[in-house]
Amino acid sequence: LEVCVDFANPVGIITKGPLVARDVDVLTALAARASVSVTISIPFIDDDMGRRIEPYVARASRRFDALATLSAAGIRTGLSISPVIPGLNDSQIPQILARARECGATTAFMTLLRLPAEVLPVFTERLREAEPLRHGHVLSAIRDVRRGNLNSSEFGDRMSGHGPRWQA
């Protein structure tokens, strides 16, 4: 980042990690010379659900704090709701958006869960362990927005869904 400051090189960062906020001084210096944006991925509103599904990433509360810190410093911030997991976190989207806006985020996008062959067994096992009573419902909801499949690798189709549930 310091090299980017020296050369006034624009930077866009997309991360799940709140540690990006520790570079607020460098990002602020860069923002004075070039375009800077930081987008933080926050797929769950609450720490408990996030910890169960994504146990090795930072808590949602820490990510929201990072958004607030960067926004308060004048850094343009955004939100990525990724992955959207139908039947699990899709109902949280309005709350996540509202909280991110309170933290100063000015842009947002979302990406539907992708389950390529190597990820599918890991996800389904984690889901079964984390949500034993809901895992069948969640898999059904994913199929609902994926035209009956758990994944689509078609270009232009991989990151979004179809049908009324996805449109909502």
Model-identified regions with their sequence ranges:
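Core AdoMet radical
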Residues: 1-67, 76-80, 107-111
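Glycine- and acidic
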Residues: 52, 78, 82, 155-161
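Non-catalytic positions within long, well-ordered alpha-helices that form the structural scaffold/packing
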Residues: 5, 71, 98-101
